[in-house]
From Swiss-Prot:
It comes from Salmonella paratyphi A (strain ATCC 9150 / SARB42). This is UPF0306 protein YhbP. SUPFAM superfamilies: FMN-binding split barrel (SSF50475). InterPro entries: Split_barrel_FMN-bd, UPF0306. HAMAP family: UPF0306. The gene is yhbP. Belongs to the UPF0306 family.
Length: 147
């Protein structure tokens, strides 16, 4: 199994992302339920335009974040650190992402919030189930690497 496939399988089983945005010298983090898109290597989420993180993001912004489980033992720790770009989706792109998102999280039908995409450009996946401190690295613009 290649690196991106391994990372993607794990991301598809999780559902909460934490991401941080920087704007005019200020940092802010947020959490949201997400849907992983393996084809585009992206996370889709809903957040209102009035939130602090959405206002700081504007139409598009650089982000960094994490996705992690909550294991009770060190040997089972798994988690992703990433950097990428967040943008608010519009039109058909938004409609398609919302439809997929609502299949995973039907309760979100009551939320009128816009759909946002976090395009993952760099991923570091720590997977202690493969050995303590084992890391898998993936970069959008180059071949996947293992470290």
């Amino acid at each position: 199994m290649d690196t991106l496939t391994a990372i993607g399988r794990w991301l598809a089983k999780q559902h909460v992302v934490t991401w941080c945005v920087h704007h005019e010298g200020e940092l802010w983090c947020a959490n949201a339920f997400y849907l992983f898109d393996a084809q585009n290597v992206a996370l889709y989420l809903l957040t209102d335009d009035k939130t602090r993180h959405a206002q700081m993001s504007g139409a598009c912004a650089s982000v960094a974040g994490t996705v992690n489980g909550q294991p009770k033992t060190v040997a089972r720790i798994r988690g992703v650190q990433f950097k990428g770009e967040i943008r608010r989706l519009e039109g058909q792109e938004s409609d398609a992402a919302r439809k997929a998102y609502l299949r995973r999280f039907p309760v979100a039908r009551v939320l009128p919030a816009p759909v946002w995409e976090i395009r993952l450009d760099e991923i570091k996946f720590t997977d202690n189930t493969l050995g303590f401190g084992k890391k898998l690295h993936w970069l959008r613009d180059s071949r996947a690497q293992q470290a």
